[in-house]
Amino acid sequence: MTKSLSEQLFETAEGLLPGGVNSPVRAFRAVGGVPRFIDRAEGSRIYDIDGREYIDYVGSWGPMILGHSHPQVVEAIRKAVERGTSYGAPTPGEIALARTIIEAFPSMEMIRMVSSGTEAVMSAIRLARGFTGRDKILKFEGCYHGHGDSLLVKAGSGVATLGIPGSPGVPACLAELTITVPFNSNEAFRKAVDRHGKELACVIVEPVAANMGVVNPRPGFLETLRELTRKAGIVLIFDEVITGFRLAYGGFQKLCRLEPDLTCLGKIIGGGLPVGAFGGKRTIMDFLAPNGPVYQAGTLSGNPLAMSAGLATLETLRSRRDDYAALDRRTADLCAAMGKLFRTAELPVRINRAGSLFTVFFTDSDVFDYETASHCNLERYARFFKGMLDRGVYLAPSAFEAAFVSFAHSDEDLEKTLQACAETIKTLGGNP
């Protein structure tokens, strides 16, 4: 049997790249089969090198809220690249993008550009430690904040996908400085602050967890974090790498009306190009070099291509800020229709949604933290993923990731997705 081009390329890649990929979840280990090698993308669609077309709900893991190859973003990149790819010097674009982000996030008075969400988080934590003079940090089980050493303890995303409790290579002394408590547990958080509060530099949280699948904060949870960190002099960091500009123009903090001390952003603020940023109160940000003693630097920080793509993306989103509600409703309608198909087939699922993000958990129990997420039926999700893929719908190749609906998804796309879902359910033993 003739192998597909994706199969041939993957065999070659396995001899050149660990696991054949440059990020573990792409290897399809959790769902089986061969990863699709993508040739191009436009709007709501991606196309693999074998010529197959898919309705894309991965969206480069979130930033493609406008759809792939958006004309204004592409044009901004084209104009920027004609002027040079990187200077290693300040550019006007840095100021324009910084001002745009700060105007959207009242909690930010200053911002520092970096090259990835991971780098933003690592730098924000270093800054919090330098500002407070404390060493310990607190994170929540199942929340993923990039692959920084201190943050791989009980993490989500690819760590959860591969079933890894942490990661070899992370020194025990670093892990000991990371306190973990269950997401959505006010009681556990209070106990941790009571015990470690005087040693904690920061508390970092995804305000909506999106890397153990989508898990919303319970009422009062984030408010408790804000109250107790403020009382204990602990820096509160919102990791909005996924939720920033995705759930609202101004991030989830605009919706929950809470202001963290620091915010981490990524992905979307570069229009899908490599970028990240962290920002917050001037009193904290002034501790960064060259103003202060906390060192952070990067050759490609604020590079002109990412700044141009990011500014074009955010300007477009700003002009469409009133359209977020409609996008949320369309996503809610899609999730409701999918839920009805599963119920008719008597297949136990929980579909968690936050704005235009959602996750299908194959479980008969509510999912509100990492423990409950980990009880979902991974084998059934893998079969669901493959069935949808075979029918032209590209979902995350992991049960612990989010699906993303974009402004580019049409009514026809959603109808085709539901049809694919109905057909796939039949292969899972259902009869909708």
Curated annotation (Swiss-Prot):
One of its GO terms (cellular component) is cytoplasm. It is found in: Cytoplasm. One of its GO terms (biological process) is protoporphyrinogen IX biosynthetic process. Pathway: Porphyrin-containing compound metabolism; protoporphyrin-IX biosynthesis; 5-aminolevulinate from L-glutamyl-tRNA(Glu): step 2/2. Keywords: Cytoplasm, Isomerase, Porphyrin biosynthesis, Pyridoxal phosphate. InterPro entries: 4pyrrol_synth_GluAld_NH2Trfase, Aminotrans_3, Aminotrans_3_PPA_site, PyrdxlP-dep_Trfase, PyrdxlP-dep_Trfase_major, PyrdxlP-dep_Trfase_small. Its EC number is 5.4.3.8. The keyword Isomerase applies. It catalyses: (S)-4-amino-5-oxopentanoate = 5-aminolevulinate. GO terms for molecular function: glutamate-1-semialdehyde 2,1-aminomutase activity; pyridoxal phosphate binding; transaminase activity. Gene3D superfamilies: Aspartate Aminotransferase, domain 1, Type I PLP-dependent aspartate aminotransferase-like (Major domain). Its cofactor is pyridoxal 5'-phosphate. The modification N6-(pyridoxal phosphate)lysine is found at K267. The keyword Isomerase applies. Belongs to the class-III pyridoxal-phosphate-dependent aminotransferase family. HemL subfamily. Homodimer. This is Glutamate-1-semialdehyde 2,1-aminomutase. It comes from Syntrophus aciditrophicus (strain SB).
